[in-house]
UniProtKB/Swiss-Prot annotation:
The lineage of its organism: Eukaryota, Metazoa, Chordata, Craniata, Vertebrata. It holds the Pfam family V1R. The chain crosses the membrane at residues 6-26, 51-71, 92-112, 130-150, 187-207, 236-258, 264-284. Residues 1-5, 72-91, 151-186, 259-263 are extracellular. Putative pheromone receptor. CDD domains: 7tm_V1R_pheromone (cd13949). One of its GO terms (molecular function) is pheromone receptor activity. This is Vomeronasal type-1 receptor 3. It comes from Pan troglodytes. Keywords: Cell membrane, G-protein coupled receptor, Glycoprotein, Membrane, Pheromone response, Receptor, Transducer, Transmembrane, Transmembrane helix. Belongs to the G-protein coupled receptor 1 family.
């Protein structure tokens, strides 16, 4: 009983911390939008990332907490379909935005070379349309079949194989459409993870080469303090590594392989699924020694927000 109470407390704490962290960043970028008139392309990407993070945390954490308290039949059939759909779309948008951040940062730190200059200009110009079309509209359409494979606990589908998610059930009378849907989602995940891996390797290579060039020009007596571009790139590398780790963690794989997991793997999977949306805003803010105070903006003073990513 004490262990279950501890798990419930962990889920509730994660919901509160993750939601507040993402709300703070969303407020930050909304403040910049209304005071400066327009956000930079990367700022808009991070704004969409905070929205997607909040959707993942709320759509996964709240129903899982209710199920942990024993309220497994609290969601109706429509409620289960809606919660699962929002969660899948939010998680896909998180992955897409992380991919955008890594690719865009490669373009940014490589812009000193002539062949990247024109690409950077086009990236700044078309990044808004790319986010809206690819990360939201595309993922909304791709996941449109998710509600067809989810039902409430009290209205389970008569199928030979039903997945138990604690607060909802998943299954289908026909396995062929569901299999095609899984293949499509997996293909998109593999594509995004592949791009992030390639971009991360490129960032490491470019930073190493720039460091060697600086050492060659100024000698080895350099300050240990890294440049702003290096700190931003390191933050994005941590974000990408966190996303790749938690999306392929053992509890998440356990949920995919076993249709009816026990209580602990079920809640462990919920905790790990929401780890990236919870951690990512603090990773972005941690590179600044002084985080801007929310109260100063609420009181009408200019808090001098630093730019998280250039």
């Amino acid at each position: 009983m004490a262990s279950k109470d501890f798990a419930i407390g962990m889920i509730l704490s994660q919901i509160m911390v993750g939601f507040l962290g993402n709300f703070f960043l969303l407020y930050h970028y909304s403040f910049l939008h209304f005071t400066r008139g327009m956000l930079q392309s990367t700022d808009l990407t991070l704004k969409h990332l905070t929205i997607a993070n909040s959707l993942v945390i709320l759509s996964k954490g709240i129903p899982q907490t209710m199920a942990a308290f024993g309220l497994k039949d609290s969601l109706s059939d429509i409620g289960c379909k809606f919660v699962f759909y929002v969660h899948r779309v939010g998680r896909a948008v998180c992955t897409g935005n992380a991919c955008l951040l890594s690719v865009f940062q490669v373009i940014t730190i490589s812009s000193s070379e002539f062949r990247w200059a024109e690409l950077k200009l086009h990236a700044h110009k078309y990044i808004r349309s790319f986010i809206l079309v690819l990360c939201w509209i595309l993922n909304t359409l791709v996941n449109i079949t998710v509600p067809l494979h989810v039902t409430g606990k009290w209205n389970s589908i008569n199928s030979t194989k039903t997945n138990d998610y604690g607060y909802c059930s998943g299954g289908s009378r026909s396995r062929i459409p569901h299999s095609l849907h899984i293949v499509l989602l997996s293909s998109l995940d593999v594509l995004c993870l592949g791009l992030m891996t390639l971009a991360s390797g490129s960032m490491v290579f470019i930073l190493h080469r720039l460091k060697q060039q600086v050492q060659h020009i100024h000698g080895t007596n350099l300050s240990p303090r890294s440049s702003p571009e290096s700190r931003v790139t390191q933050s994005i590398l941590v974000l990408v590594s966190t996303l790749c780790y938690f999306t392929r963690s053992p509890p998440s794989l356990h949920m995919s392989l076993f249709p009816n997991p026990s209580w602990w793997p079920l809640n462990a999977s919920a905790l790990i699924t929401a780890c990236f949306p919870t951690v990512s805003p603090f990773v972005l803010m941690s590179r600044h020694p002084r985080i801007p105070r929310l109260g100063s903006a609420c009181c009408g003073r200019n808090p001098q927000f630093p730019k998280l990513v250039r």
